[in-house]
Amino acid sequence: MLKIYNTLTRQKEEFHPQQAGIVNMYVCGPTVYNYIHIGNARSVVAFDTVRRYLEFSGYQVNYVSNFTDVDDKMIKAAKEQGITVPELAYKYIQAYMEDTAALNVEPATTHPRATENIDGIISFIEDLIEKGYAYQSGGDVYYRARKFAHYGQLSGQSLDDLEVGASEHVSTEEVAKKKDPLDFALWKAAKPGEIKWDSPWGAGRPGWHIECSVMSTKYLGDTLDIHAGGQDLEFPHHENEIAQSEAKTGHRFVNYWMHNGFVTIGRDNEKMSKSLGNFVTVHDLIKEVDPQVLRFFMSTTQYRRPIQYSQESLVEAQANLEHLKNTYDNLAYRLKDATSGTDGGVQRQLADFRARFVAAMDDDINVQNGIAVVYELMRFANQYVEQRLVQREPIVAIQLMLKRLVAVFGVDLAVSATEINDEKIKELIEKRNAARAEKDFALSDQIRDQLRDQGIILEDTPQGTRYRKESN
């Protein structure tokens, strides 16, 4: 039984979606004013991995992830670049889709945009005003935070603590408009030159928090099975979403809240962020690092834990992924000389590997324990293919199991599986030299033939074995 750590209750809970076999999941997407950095991508990859495991477990996942395409940051960035806010949004939405595709992130079922839902946002706000949860003030509309009985529950903060924090961050202009420092904006009156829409309260634009309430409930209903995002969104964004949504619908907004840990960088383990200027964009990094390696690096740390970003971590991820790909390739190669037949022992072993993988992942998507099982499967596969005589059916079964389990982490072992790089060639040459030293000429010939089939010609010389790539 899958258990998920619910931020709202601060404990692991058995996962029971509202509708058997179907999961409605909403993940807060990016504000599209720049390229996403590794910290942003952590959330994307973490919850894509959660989605993949849910699908592996047999669920149909309705996955909605939004684009915030209008807010203060968007307006500022558009002005700096000398383009309109819609032009800025288009530019970085395209970049986001390209970068996440490179990381093998499955497209969301729906990618709604705030600017495409203005009518729904206005209607939502009107309903909150009618119910007494919101009020107009000087062209702005604010939510009455204290009126919502459970305000602060998600983040575990008292109203007194929240009031102190809010008072420190409220501008003089806002103090004049708000009835309470805790109140937050649902609609903002337009300033000269800003993008705007007509509304019952005058020209303006939506606040950030209301956008997600409107888009999530529009596509997934009043109650979501899972709502996810970074830990930094817990307050105020997700706290405010709950207040808005439950005040309007009268129903519980979310059954399971999931929040991912940060990516840290440097000796002091600082959180990676644009505001600190210590970020590395995915757009730039994938020009230097294999996107599959970056994906594997991020998807093999449990989503609630922080990730320390470093070159050493990427090198380690690359080595581990290379071992998995080599194993997959070796299985494919041994199919050529495999005999027909089955092996009940192998099937039982594979069933055990799968059961242990599921047990690990069912524990709040514990990918670290899950990948440990995959590495055990890899060692088992390598031991099997090193036998002199192998059977076709067990090899196919091992290969399929390895591919399916690794796919949960967003990596396709079949991609470029037939390609061979210099590192792998040298590894096989060393293995062949060891076989020759032990007078295992059958294995030596097998490795030579394997390389030749992939266009690599070996030449044994007094100075050692050299290789060249066969010309077409």
Swiss-Prot record:
Cofactor binding description: Binds 1 zinc ion per subunit.
InterPro entries (alphabetical): Cys-tRNA-ligase (IPR015803), Cys-tRNA-synt_Ia_DALR (IPR015273), Cys-tRNA/MSH_ligase (IPR024909), CysS_C (IPR056411), Rossmann-like_a/b/a_fold (IPR014729), tRNA-synt_1_cat_dom (IPR032678), tRNAsynth_Ia_anticodon-bd (IPR009080)
Phosphoprotein listed as a keyword: no
Extent of motif 'HIGH' region: 30-40
The reaction(s) this protein catalyses: tRNA(Cys) + L-cysteine + ATP = L-cysteinyl-tRNA(Cys) + AMP + diphosphate
Cofactor names: Zn(2+)
Recorded name of the encoding gene: cysS
Family: Belongs to the class-I aminoacyl-tRNA synthetase family.
CDD domains xrefs: CysRS_core
Residue span of motif 'KMSKS' region: 271-275
Keywords, comma-separated and alphabetical: Aminoacyl-tRNA synthetase, ATP-binding, Cytoplasm, Ligase, Metal-binding, Nucleotide-binding, Protein biosynthesis, Zinc
Ligand binding (ATP): K274
Subunit (UniProt): Monomer.
EC number: 6.1.1.16
GO cellular-component term (any): cytosol
Annotated protein name in UniProt: Cysteine--tRNA ligase
Principal subcellular localisation of the protein: cytoplasm
Cellular localisation: Cytoplasm
Residues holding Zn(2+): C28, C212, H237, E241
GO function terms (MF aspect): ATP binding; cysteine-tRNA ligase activity; zinc ion binding
Highest taxon above the source species: Bacteria
GO terms for biological process, alphabetical: cysteinyl-tRNA aminoacylation
